[in-house]
Amino acid sequence: MSAFDDAIAAPVEKDTVADLRVLDSKKRGAEARAADEVAKAVLLGRFRHNPGLGWLEWEGRRWDGGEVATDRVHETVRQFVDEVERNYRAEVAEQAATGALIVDEIEQQVPKERRTKDDGKPMKPGDVVQAFGTKEQKAAFDKAADAAQAANTQAEIWLNLLTAGHVASVAKLCRGMDGILTRAAEFDAHPDLLNCRNGVVDLRTGQLQPHDPELLITKLAGAAYDPTARSQLWDQALSAVHPDALEWFQIRMGQSITGHTPDDDAIVVSVGGGENGKTGVTVGIMRACGTYGRLISHRILIAHPGQHPTELMDLRGLRFALMEETPEEGRLNTHQLKMTIGTPQITARKMRHDDITFDTTHTLLVNTNHQPIVDATDHGTWRRLKALPWPYTFLPPGVTPTKENERVGDRTLKPRLDTDEGVAAAALAWLVNGAVKWYAAGRISPADPAPVVEATALWRRVSDVGLRFAQENLIADPDRYITADVLRAQFNATLEAQGKHTWSAQTINERFSASLLAAGIPVKGTPKKPTKILDHHRESQPDPEPPPNGVPRPSSVRHLDSPAAAEKTAAKKTARVWMGVRFLTRAEKRQRDADPDRTLHAVAGE
């Protein structure tokens, strides 16, 4: 009882919290038992944990994660353990004070000389009570002593937990508890909602509702939502968009802030040289999106041999994904295009981590001065690409516009778009309005306006060498055909003249049908398998090149409708040919070049 005797004279230290948490007196399982108490007292409702995302903290508007959240969990655990330990120390002091009062009562009734031991030293408080106290006083004193001893034991146990290692262990044990452990799929699982600084917007209606931790939203837009917000700077930025494409662009960008992928699996590629205003518009959109938007690496879509696929992880949970300035001569990775656009889930991994699979939520906008090269000819690739031209060039101050597409520029616009408080709010209102329109149309994007159709067709014609060859050299004709060898020879000769790699027979057989179809030539047979040659079918071959200076020269390409060649092919009855197509004659090419708007029609027997 000597420890209690020593504590009787100590002052009582009161703490703001009187809560006491009892752990095993033998210190067995102290961390696990402490974790239960910590989770219930200070973590539930404030913190969540997911193995892939780590700790997240509710900050009043969203669940915020990262290393800071982990540090805050550890500090919260440390403060709680420290507070409980100090409460037990205060309990020891309070019980000691109770014992001191009992001793004082006895000492007032017993003379000092009687409270002295044989060796002349004063008796200890406990000995005084046992020697002179009443039955009631002894019972009260023993009760206080037992309580103090128990509190002191608990204080020692909790004090032992006040090390970095124990605090981290307690926090780790809390991660798997109900109400804290959360599946990744539960976060940001409301694609129709947008978390703004003043509440949560239902993008289907534009209505605002209060923030709610039960929604488990981790993202936050860059402004408060006000449907009436306007900004002269934002209106000035939007004036750079082609007027015939402005509403289309608004609805497209409105769809991009939802958690739904584009209904047509498309990406918008903003095309145009420098000083055309597209960067200013995307600055406003990115500011409005806040953490819902992100600038992503062009390596996601531009082929780089041997690259590590970690960039795809940037798309996890993202809504508006912006890719700025693809490299000149960059070649579009069509495989990754199909992996990232129009697929319900994406599999990726962080460096030195295992693969994970997550739902696709993003919409991609590409800003580029140089259109990526697209080697693919298939419809599946080109249906995903929409080129948005930015028609104007904004000139430096003092330079007078001389062309129809030139405008007087404002060099202060972009920095002001980047800093003005009203721009983010106005851009957010514009985006939400576009989203509401998209939902009102049944979540169907509007038809592409003429500028987009024309720019995309031009891009495809430039990129698709097969399409360009077909448009310049071929025409549909149901009764004509071109043998596989002849078409390959002519096509590869064209590629060689352009300094491009030639195609193998297999590549032509696999890809040229899509080019023909895009050129409006729906062939009825391809060299993939033999086609039956009927009596009325006639072989087509290119016109021979005119001899230089009238001097004939040999040619490895057979002349148009060579009787011997036609008879040889017809005798086979089946052959590997392109059926339903023929070469344009030189006369037809001259006619087309003289009147580009006139449509050429194939005439049987021509």
List where the protein language model places each region.
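N-terminal acidic, proline/glycine-rich, low-complexity intrinsically disordered segments
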Residues: 1-10
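Feature primarily recognizes SF3-like P-loop helicase cores of small DNA viruses
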Residues: 10-49, 97-606
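GGW-centered surface loops in extracellular recognition modules
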Residues: 50-54
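Amphipathic alpha-helical packing elements
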Residues: 55-58, 208
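Trp- and S/T/G-rich repeat-edge/linker motifs of beta-rich repeat architectures
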Residues: 57, 62-80, 84
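Compact, glycine/acidic-enriched structural inserts
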Residues: 87-94
